[in-house]
């Protein structure tokens, strides 16, 4: 018990010792790049410097004694995203600081700043990070070298220099320029360059050229002496080589300063003088003759190399790198070599960053006044702003490299740089070649308080000149602007100027003398004078002339004296045709100097509308004036030639040519024409008018007075102005305007200069010369004739009158005239010939379009021909035949052949007409052909009732051939059971089928009509299997049965037993009775890919809309006309025949005579409360088995407009109910018709959203959306317009597609008139679908819509239908109660008001009770050569079928209407039946009668309605089955 104080004291001492040994653990983060795409990554080499620094800090008792620095590191691969992710995770895990990252650091620095975590980077030169307060770095950024550069430039007084830099150095270049400018230094050039030659050549830049550097030197050498080069070492070598080539180093005047941020290495210093790829192949230390001179012109600013102790540091780094946590093993190759090569300066930067951080935290903890708990220590150590401020305030730190490094105000290390120069230094280069000179450090920069100080090491630099350093500019400046000119130079300059002035004056005098001499030569005729011997084809005695023609009126007015006109001739001068005008004189005529000058002036005049003066041939008594020849003669000749029609364009072009020519003359030295008249306006072969016979007035007047008589003299004066006639002067500009007015009058009147004035020329001249009295109009040509002829516009006539005004000053200038007559050309600036050429070019282009169109049509016809051939023969066979190649027979090991015939066909053929037999086989084989499309089979031929199909050729299909034939046969047998014979509906078609499997040989037989035939016993055996079979059964051979068994048991067979066959004896055969899910299934056939019927191809017709992309659906809202590429034959399902498709055939109603119409039309008592139920065409009777079992309906969710409704009739009109569906059918793809079994369900459906059921048409082209956008609002039927006494035909709607302006219908057009009925419509342009309109009428009227098929000129009419029930007679109630409400109760004639709403009015094929020659209706096809309508029936009202096929709610009564269809009436079906039959074959309807489809189906008990088809009396037999009319 007495020892417990001692034990307590011992425990306390132990606790105190443990507390004194406790150290807070701070985790530091390290981001490096060990792997990745960073080319300069250093993580593998320098990471050991971090662990070395951390180990030294943790072991140093004087540095962070209570703190233990732990390490966490990440390999960021130099990627910013990975580095950011690592920093985020480290911060969340509570690190105190981050060393790194390696590579980009700006984003990472911002992230650390956001959490105030200090970041010290050892390898990041991104200058943007300097502004972040929590960021510092031990690697000096590139911009830090600027301070050292400026210290070097200031030291040597290089205040003018040029900067050449690569793009990555642009921040350094910008900072250098900015700092140099602040220090009053001059930047001569600042120019960037591109070092990447591959990039230069890919982008076709200037740097791709071999002379790029030489050009750069040439552009800068004359304005600089000092270059600061910022770029790669290879670029430096190329640049200095170009300077050496330019001879810039010969005199030692140029200096290049290169900047290298890497630490100087003696072994790598060769890169400053030679390209890296040239060092290996060095043969000596001096690669060129002037190499030493060039090398001395280079100074390099590089990072100061470390001390010798640095080598020991690198070895320690290597050891630590191989230890945990990095465990980086050094390759043996590196171990054997000098490892110092692989430990870069960045290891020292990394080491310094750790030591700098530890020092700063230690200082902060020593200054901390709080108790140093773990939380306090972590808070101090992770305070980024405070840590970085502590580092910055210290200003300097001692680096492991042995240098004292300064830190600037942003926390960036300013680095330690040295200057390298070419000095004597013995060393061995990379090829172990001894060299005496090398780039070695010659100076360093001492870090001062503000700026580094430049200090030399051991002497001076060897300058290239051998003595003084190069100056930054020449002594007298780059442009000698600093040197004063001495007297000698000044005297020489003055002498040179005086001599130059004297030479210039002498030259001017000489040129003046020469020009005067040349003018004299021109005047004397050396240029304009023509030797008479040069003119060929002309003589004074044999003049080939083209005398001007005189009009008949002129000849009558002036007599024969008008024919003595002055004429011109043609000749040839130097091979060219020229126009020659002869001036004759009675005696020798001397050419004065003034005339010679004028001839020279005439020769210099050149303009498109001036007839060029070539020269003159001077003889003693005559002068020949030679000008250009104009093939069309003079304007006077054209005006007097009545065969030439002058239209407005022609006249405008001639007048404007004349105006342009006169403007040129008036602006020339000639000043005026003086002799302007229509005979002096000539026209070239291009119908361009040119003015001629201007100038030389003295010669012309003298020659004229001597050579012509008085009459001709005065006639030539008819174009002269009054003032010229009175004063006898040669001419003036205003006189030319007067002559222009006379010429304009000539052109428009074409009756001479003064029209029909019956005066002699002398009298006319006297009247013109006479001054008019006051208020009297001057004597001018009469203009009443051109006013009456309306050949001259008013503004032209006003211009003429202004131009021949008596007062010359009132006459306009030609420039004003041109503006006033601009309207004549209609804005066109080209002349006649240019416009004609433009028209010809358009015509040629049009011809090219026509040729292209014809070529396209030819290609289409070729495609049709190839299509026909491919239908007759297999595609591979047809292609060989098309290419002219022979088709060799091919043997097939196993195929399966199908044969079938019709039992009792011979008897049926004997009892039927040929046309009925043909139609029957066509319907049957149409079903067959549609079914076999879904199987891999080939139809060989059909002969009569025989149908032959094969599988396994011409393309082999392995063992599937038997299954393909078997599945096809089962479906054909099922379809036959559903099929009904059109002319014998009570009889069942008995098909007998046989199948056999075996080898065959297939080949083409024949040349004229080649056929693809099969040969071999297999064909005969298959035929025997069919002939020995039974009706409605499939008889197969034993081989076929075995082939089917190989397919997995998908087919059900029944053994028949032994059957004796001709040529085979007793053979075992089988019945094929069915198939299960393992059988070969029918492949889906895309309806879009199915080819159209061969003989229903569209024919070109101008009636068709050229838009071939529009759907061919009749009477559809918002739809266009039928497509030329689309067939109007409705597309059926596999089980449907032509017989079962009659419900979609468009029919044409008959014309009803007015007498019958008046007799049969019942009174209108109002429309009652009936309403439209559906807009869908329903398939025939409920009992019809030809409708598909798998029909689909189109269920659409349409937008509702209001409540529920449709269109109902009440009182005297139709009332549009709300909730009408407005979704256009173009938005919904049509679907199949529902089966007859579904019809009662539709009839009982009272839902307003009843589905619209449509038969799918062959044309599935979508409606163009632009037409949907441009459609007009639908026109509704106003209830007020169906008055009691109104039933006239209704034109409603808007012609949306045709754009017919008459298509717009107003409310006043929507009346019905009892005195009118429906117009006949053209059904030959019908579309693929027609939907019946189901109606109910409570007052005995059945309004029906009729829509013409000739869209867009369509007409929709509402006509009163129905007559008294019961035998076609009396009251409308009679027999009404006997009419059933559904299709299986058929009746003919009228429709009673009590009839059920859901009883549809449908179309069907003619029954046996009506002979085919009486069934006159159009088969729905494309436009044909002849439209035929059936003859009228037995009287009664015509009924048209509903056209409301839009996908909308029943009762939504919207109509289309175009212009009246009176011009589209069908031609009557006249002529013999043979003619009609041949016409339908041409139409593509096959051999069926073109009259076989004008049919209709009415519910039983419905009488009196004129359907537009041949009427048929109701019979008991007809009432028991589907009534076929």
Curated annotation (Swiss-Prot):
Residues 1147-1162 have a biased composition (Basic and acidic residues). Keywords: ATP-binding, Cell membrane, cGMP biosynthesis, Glycoprotein, GTP-binding, Lyase, Magnesium, Membrane, Metal-binding, Nucleotide-binding, Receptor, Signal, Transmembrane, Transmembrane helix. GO terms for molecular function: ATP binding; GTP binding; guanylate cyclase activity; metal ion binding; peptide receptor activity; semaphorin receptor binding; signaling receptor activity. The keyword ATP-binding applies. In the adult, widely distributed in the head and thorax with highest levels in the optic lobe and central brain and expression also detected in the retina. Expressed at similar levels in adult head and body. In females, highly expressed in oocytes with lower levels in the digestive tract. In mid-embryogenesis, enriched in the circular visceral mesoderm that overlies the migrating salivary gland and in the fat body that underlies the gland but at background levels in the gland itself. It is found in: Cell membrane. ATP binds at residues 553-561, 581. Residues 515-1525 are cytoplasmic. Residues 1202-1212 have a biased composition (Gly residues). SUPFAM superfamilies: Nucleotide cyclase, Periplasmic binding protein-like I, Protein kinase-like (PK-like). Mg(2+) 2 binds at residues 901-902, 945. Belongs to the adenylyl cyclase class-4/guanylyl cyclase family. This is Receptor-type guanylate cyclase Gyc76C. The lineage of its organism: Eukaryota, Metazoa, Ecdysozoa, Arthropoda, Hexapoda. The gene is Gyc76C.
């Amino acid at each position: 018990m007495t020892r417990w104080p001692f034990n307590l004291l011992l425990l306390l001492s132990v606790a105190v010792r443990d507390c004194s040994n406790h150290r807070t653990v701070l985790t530091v983060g390290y981001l490096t790049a060990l792997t990745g795409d960073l080319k300069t990554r250093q993580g593998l080499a320098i990471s050991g410097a971090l662990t070395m620094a951390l180990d030294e800090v943790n072991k140093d008792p004087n540095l962070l004694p209570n703190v233990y620095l732990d390490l966490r590191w990440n390999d960021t691969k130099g990627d910013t995203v990975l580095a950011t992710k690592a920093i985020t995770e480290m911060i969340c895990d509570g690190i105190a600081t981050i060393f790194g990252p390696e590579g980009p650091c700006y984003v990472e620095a911002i992230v650390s700043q956001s959490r105030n975590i200090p970041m010290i980077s050892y390898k990041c030169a991104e200058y943007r990070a300097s502004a972040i307060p929590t960021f510092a770095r031990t690697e000096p950024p590139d911009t830090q070298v600027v301070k050292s550069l400026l210290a070097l430039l200031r030291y040597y007084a290089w205040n003018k220099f040029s900067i050449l830099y690569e793009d990555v150095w642009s921040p350094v270049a910008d900072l250098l320029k900015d700092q140099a400018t602040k220090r009053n230094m001059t930047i001569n050039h600042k120019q960037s360059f591109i070092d990447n030659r591959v990039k230069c050549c890919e982008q076709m830049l200037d740097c791709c050229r071999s002379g790029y550097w030489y050009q750069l030197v040439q552009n800068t050498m004359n304005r600089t002496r000092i270059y600061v080069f910022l770029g790669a070492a290879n670029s430096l070598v190329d640049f200095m080589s170009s300077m050496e080539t330019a001879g810039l180093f010969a005199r030692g005047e140029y200096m290049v300063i290169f900047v290298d941020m890497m630490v100087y290495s003696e072994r790598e210093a060769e890169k400053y003088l030679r390209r890296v790829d040239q060092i290996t192949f060095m043969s000596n230390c001096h690669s060129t003759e002037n190499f030493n001179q060039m090398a001395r012109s280079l100074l390099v600013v590089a990072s100061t190399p470390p001390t010798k102790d640095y080598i020991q540091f690198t070895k320690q780094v290597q050891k630590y790198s191989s230890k945990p946590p990095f465990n980086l093993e050094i390759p043996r190759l590196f171990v054997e070599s000098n490892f110092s090569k692989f430990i870069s300066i960045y290891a020292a930067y990394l080491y310094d960053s750790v030591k700098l951080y530890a020092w700063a935290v230690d200082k902060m903890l020593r200054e901390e006044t709080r108790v140093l708990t773990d939380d306090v220590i972590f808070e101090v150590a992770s305070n980024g702003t405070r840590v970085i401020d502590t580092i910055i305030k210290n200003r300097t730190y001692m680096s492991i490299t042995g240098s004292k490094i300064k830190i600037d105000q942003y926390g960036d290390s300013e680095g330690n740089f040295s200057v390298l120069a070419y000095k004597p230094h013995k060393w061995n280069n990379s090829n172990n070649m001894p060299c005496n000179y090398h780039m070695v450090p010659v100076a360093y920069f001492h870090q001062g308080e503000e700026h580094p100080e430049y200090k030399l090491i051991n002497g001076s630099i060897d300058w290239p000149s051998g003595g003084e350093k190069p100056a930054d500019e020449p002594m007298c400046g780059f442009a000698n602007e600093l040197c004063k000119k001495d007297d000698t130079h000044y005297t020489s300059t003055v002498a040179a100027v005086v001599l130059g002035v004297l030479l210039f004056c002498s030259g001017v005098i000489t040129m003046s003398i020469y020009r005067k001499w040349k003018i004299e030569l021109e005047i004397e005729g050396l240029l304009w004078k023509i030797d008479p011997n040069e003119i060929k084809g002309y003589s004074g005695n044999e003049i080939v002339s083209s005398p001007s023609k005189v009009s008949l009126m002129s000849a009558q007015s002036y007599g024969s004296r008008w024919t003595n006109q002055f004429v011109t001739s043609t000749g040839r001068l130097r091979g060219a045709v020229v126009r020659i005008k002869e001036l004759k004189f009675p005696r020798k005529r001397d050419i004065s100097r003034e005339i010679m000058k004028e001839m020279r002036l005439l020769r210099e005049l050149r303009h498109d509308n001036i007839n060029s003066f070539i020269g003159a041939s001077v003889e003693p008594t005559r002068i020949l004036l030679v000008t250009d020849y104009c093939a069309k003669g003079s304007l006077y000749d054209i005006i007097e030639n009545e065969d030439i029609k002058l239209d407005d364009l022609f006249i405008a072009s001639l007048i404007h040519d004349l105006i342009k020519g006169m403007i040129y003359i008036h602006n020339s030295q000639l000043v005026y024409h003086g002799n302007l008249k229509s005979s002096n306006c000539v026209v070239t072969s291009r119908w361009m008018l040119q003015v001629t016979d201007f100038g030389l007035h003295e010669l012309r007047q003298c020659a004229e007075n001597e050579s012509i008589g008085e009459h001709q003299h005065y006639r030539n004066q008819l174009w002269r102005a009054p003032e010229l006639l009175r004063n006898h002067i040669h001419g003036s500009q205003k006189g030319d305007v007067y002559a222009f007015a006379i010429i304009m009058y000539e052109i428009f009147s074409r009756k001479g200069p003064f029209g029909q004035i019956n005066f002699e020329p002398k009298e006319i001249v006297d009247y013109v010369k006479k001054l008019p009295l006051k208020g009297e109009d001057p004597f001018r040509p009469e203009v009443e004739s051109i006013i009456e002829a309306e050949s001259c516009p008013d503004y032209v006539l006003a211009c003429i009158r202004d131009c021949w005004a008596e007062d010359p000053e009132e006459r306009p200038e030609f420039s004003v005239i041109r503006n006033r007559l601009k309207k004549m050309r209609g804005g066109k600036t080209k002349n006649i010939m240019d416009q004609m050429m433009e028209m010809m070019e358009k015509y040629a282009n049009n011809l090219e379009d026509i040729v292209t169109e014809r070529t396209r049509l030819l290609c289409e016809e070729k495609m049709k021909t190839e299509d026909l051939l491919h239908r007759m023969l297999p595609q591979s066979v047809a292609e060989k035949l098309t290419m002219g190649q022979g088709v060799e027979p091919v043997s097939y090991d196993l195929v399966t052949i199908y044969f079938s015939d019709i039992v009792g066909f011979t008897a049926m053929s004997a009892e039927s007409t040929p046309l009925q037999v043909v139609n029957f086989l066509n319907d049957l084989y149409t079903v067959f052909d549609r079914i076999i499309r879904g199987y891999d089979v080939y139809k060989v031929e059909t002969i009569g009732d025989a149908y032959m199909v094969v599988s396994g050729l011409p393309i082999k299909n392995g063992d599937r051939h038997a299954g393909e034939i078997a599945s096809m046969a089962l479906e054909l047998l099922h379809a036959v059971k559903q099929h009904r014979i059109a002319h014998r509906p009570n009889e069942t078609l008995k098909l007998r089928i046989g199948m056999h499997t075996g080898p065959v040989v297939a080949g083409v037989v024949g040349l004229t009509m080649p056929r693809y035939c099969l040969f071999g016993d297999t064909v005969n055996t298959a035929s025997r299997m069919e002939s020995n079979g039974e009706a409605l059964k499939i008889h197969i051979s034993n081989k076929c049965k075995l082939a089917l068994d190989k397919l997995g048991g998908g087919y059900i067979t029944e053994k028949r037993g032994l059957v004796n066959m001709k040529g085979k004896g007793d053979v075992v055969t089988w019945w094929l009775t069915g198939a299960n899910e393992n059988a070969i299934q029918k492949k889906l056939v895309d309806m879009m890919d199915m080819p159209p019927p061969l003989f229903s191809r569209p024919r070109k017709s101008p009636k068709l809309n050229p838009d071939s992309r529009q759907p061919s659906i009749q009477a559809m809202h918002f739809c266009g006309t039928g497509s030329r590429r689309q067939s109007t034959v409705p597309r059926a399902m596999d089980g449907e025949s032509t017989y079962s498709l009659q419900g979609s055939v468009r029919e044409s109603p008959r014309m009803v005579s007015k007498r019958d119409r008046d007799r049969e039309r019942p009174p209108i008592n109002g429309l009652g409360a009936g309403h439209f139920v559906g807009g869908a065409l329903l398939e025939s009777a409920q009992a019809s088995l030809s409708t598909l079992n798998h029909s689909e309906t189109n269920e659409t969710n349409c937008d509702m407009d209001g409540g529920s409704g449709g269109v109902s009739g009440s009182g005297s009109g139709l009332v549009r109910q709300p909730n009408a569906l407005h979704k256009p059918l173009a938005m919904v793809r049509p679907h199949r018709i529902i089966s007859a079994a579904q019809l009662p369900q539709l009839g009982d459906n009272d839902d307003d959203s009843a589905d619209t059921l449509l038969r799918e048409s062959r044309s599935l082209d979508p409606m163009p959306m632009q037409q949907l956008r441009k459609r007009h609002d639908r026109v509704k039927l106003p209830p007020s317009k169906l008055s009691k006494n109104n039933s006239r035909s209704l034109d409603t709607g808007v012609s949306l597609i045709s754009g017919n302006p008459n298509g717009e219908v107003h409310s006043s057009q929507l009346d019905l008139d009892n005195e009118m009925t429906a117009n006949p419509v053209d059904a030959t342009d019908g579309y693929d679908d027609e939907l019946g309109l189901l109606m109910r009428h409570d007052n005995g009227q059945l309004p029906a819509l009729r829509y013409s098929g000739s869209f867009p000129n369509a007409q929709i009419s509402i006509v009163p239908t129905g007559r008294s029930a019961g035998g076609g007679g009396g009251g409308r109630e009679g027999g009404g109660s006997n009419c059933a409400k559904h299709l299986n109760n058929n009746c003919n004639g009228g429709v009673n008001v009590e009839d059920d709403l859901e009883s549809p009015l449908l179309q069907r094929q003619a029954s046996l009770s009506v002979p085919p020659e009486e069934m006159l209706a159009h088969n729905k096809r494309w436009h044909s050569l002849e439209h035929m309508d059936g003859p009228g029936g037995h009287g009664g009202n015509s009924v048209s079928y509903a056209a409301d096929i839009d996908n909308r709610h029943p009762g939504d009564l919207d109509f289309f209407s175009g212009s009246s269809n009176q011009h589209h009436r069908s031609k009557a079906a006249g002529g013999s039946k043979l003619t009609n039959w041949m016409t339908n074959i041409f139409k593509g309807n096959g051999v069926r009668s073109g009259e076989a489809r004008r049919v209709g189906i009415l519910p039983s008990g419905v009488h009196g309605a004129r359907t537009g088809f041949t009427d048929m009396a109701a019979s008991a037999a007809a009432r028991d089955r589907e009534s076929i009319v």
